[in-house]
């Protein structure tokens, strides 16, 4: 019983909410492998560390002998998950969905054990649905129940349109749990309504309801908004070792602990020991370096993690400019404002970000901190431009004919 209690405690660690906890404990105490399901709609080709919070939890279940079902929602992706959206999402083509799904499989096996993972596609059963099946599924829930979901409710009360097919999405996702006979389903906190729909439909179809385990949405590099490619505050798992290492080293010490808690493969006990060592005088930077190496090694290898570490020391801690820095060329008719220039050479994602970075004192030209975003660099010269700790470019500005 002590062993089972420690397993249960480790599996629950890092979860935002578990519904219901007693049922999870009861299922684990049976001592038989459980079916652990997690669904992913392949609506974008690349994953970032935010996605791996859930994948890490799946990996834990594998380590304790349970069966992990990595469900690719190729059918539902062609509908588009309306969760958190204030407008109807455009459906994707089957070709795009299948191409993204292939990329997903390659990426997730950097974390999951392929020999202990069943990859399923919900088109396997949803493609067999006929009109009668769909109507019967729709009849299990009311419009009033659907409007309990925050995003639907907001759109309804503000007069924004809700397409009928959007109501079908949570029902179809829930039916996946029926088809797979899932014991546990994992998902982000933003998926709560859809996850609970799986429980309700399993009860309706006469199955033991799944336990729902929700993992938190991890903050991006800014420490405020959730990690997202669209907000440019993410660490992609396909990024180069140097990019990964530099981004992790750029986060605050407070955010570092959040990342370690949710992303490290260390046990809860080991993490507590790390925190205690910092309280006793260990430099948090050293903990961050070890964590950065752990993440880089996971998605690349240990040799590249050490190489990225050495490059980081050379570039940032010693203040050196890399010798192999590629020179960019910008041909313009007349000088342009620095804020616009930074965006043009992809050191920032937008002019507004450029302005913000300059005002924060994060932009240097040839080692000098710049305070004026409207500064115009003379044409006919080369410059070393730095934005923050990890974005750097050698730029030659040339006169257009």
From Swiss-Prot:
GO terms for biological process: tyrosyl-tRNA aminoacylation. Keywords: Aminoacyl-tRNA synthetase, ATP-binding, Cytoplasm, Ligase, Nucleotide-binding, Protein biosynthesis, RNA-binding. Residues 336-397 form the S4 RNA-binding domain. InterPro entries: aa-tRNA-synth_I_CS (IPR001412), aa-tRNA-synth_Ic (IPR002305), Rossmann-like_a/b/a_fold (IPR014729), S4_RNA-bd (IPR002942), S4_RNA-bd_sf (IPR036986), Tyr-tRNA-ligase (IPR002307), Tyr-tRNA-ligase_bac-type (IPR024088), Tyr-tRNA-ligase_bac_2 (IPR024108). ATP binds at residue 229. PROSITE patterns: AA_TRNA_LIGASE_I (PS00178), S4 (PS50889). The keyword Flavoprotein does not apply. A motif ('KMSKS' region) lies at residues 226-230. Its EC number is 6.1.1.1. The keyword Iron does not apply. A motif ('HIGH' region) lies at residues 42-51. Its main location: cytoplasm. One of its GO terms (molecular function) is RNA binding. It catalyses: tRNA(Tyr) + L-tyrosine + ATP = L-tyrosyl-tRNA(Tyr) + AMP + diphosphate + H(+). NCBIfam families: tyrS. Belongs to the class-I aminoacyl-tRNA synthetase family. TyrS type 2 subfamily. Catalyzes the attachment of tyrosine to tRNA(Tyr) in a two-step reaction: tyrosine is first activated by ATP to form Tyr-AMP and then transferred to the acceptor end of tRNA(Tyr). Homodimer. This is Tyrosine--tRNA ligase. It comes from Legionella pneumophila subsp. pneumophila (strain Philadelphia 1 / ATCC 33152 / DSM 7513).
